[in-house]
Amino acid sequence: NNIKVSVLGSDGYTCQIPRIKEGMKLLGHTLSEDSPDLIYSNDPKGYEKALILKEKYPNAYLIFNFLDIPWHIENIERQTELLVKNFFLKADAVSVISSKVQKDMAKFYDKKIHVIYNPIKDVYFDEKIKKNNMFLYVGRANDPVKRIKLVHDSIIKIPEGLKNIKICGSENPGFGNYVGVISDKDLNKLYNSSKFVLLPSKAEGIGLPMIEGMICGTIPVTCSDNLTAREFSPSEFICEPNAQSIVNKIEELDKEYETKREMALKLGEKYKIQFDKKTIAKNIIDIFNSEKN
């Protein structure tokens, strides 16, 4: 059954909305804000507009999705309580992007919380691309939770380390080869040509570079205090959140690189389907169908 869907939230090249919209279209649904059957907001940026649409079209089914609780922010408990009161309690359903966020949100919201994940970029394993780059970092480098300093302090201990890292995203941390925001095609080449993707974040909603890396046969190195890493990544790729531990982990993985890379690729095959934009769109529609009927 094809339905009319409004997809709201942060809508920019580096955001998830463009891919969720593509997923909806691939499933044959129509994107529309004119008497939609389903209103979906991927993050708080779209919540207000979603409520206005819901008031206008009370029969529409409203889903609020939530990305993650940034525990490091002052008054975050209070802010989250207000979010629940002002928004979640007015929704027909609430979803999140990982089991970790589901557990976090359950402290504030006692109704059912669906896990839908969020879509990866259009990346894939390309065996023709040679591994000619050692390290890759993908993400908003200056967000304190991302702990970019750990990347710097680790690779500075590795000969030529600083020369062998490429950093892509909207923020320049001031070291390594910063390439800025790049197309999916170029990002795909970067993942495939790099040996390791470093993601030492303290917390992530998902940590898509870890997933995208494995899909492309790049080993993600993550930290043990990031609970989402433990949800999706093998324990062999996880180390303590300090520079020496990261260096030791890189050296250990590099010694058995081919075997460990196979492990990443194997998981990547599963994640390529699980995190595909069409799958995510279907997960959203499934909530609508199961609750509506």
Would you name each region that the model predicts?
Residues 38-40, 53-74, 95:
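Active-site proximal beta-strand in glycosyltransferases
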Residues 76-94:
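Membrane-proximal helix-turn-helix segments that form the acceptor-binding/catalytic region
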Residues 223, 233-244, 250-257:
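Conserved acidic donor-binding segment of nucleotide-sugar-dependent glycosyltransferases
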Residues 100, 119:
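Carbohydrate-associated surface elements
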Residues 12, 255-289:
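A charged, aromatic-enriched C-terminal amphipathic alpha-helix characteristic of glycosyltransferases
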Residues 88, 189-194:
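Short alpha-helical donor nucleotide-sugar binding micro-motif in glycosyltransferases
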Residues 202:
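Aromatic "clamp/platform" in nucleotide-sugar-dependent glycosyltransferases that forms part
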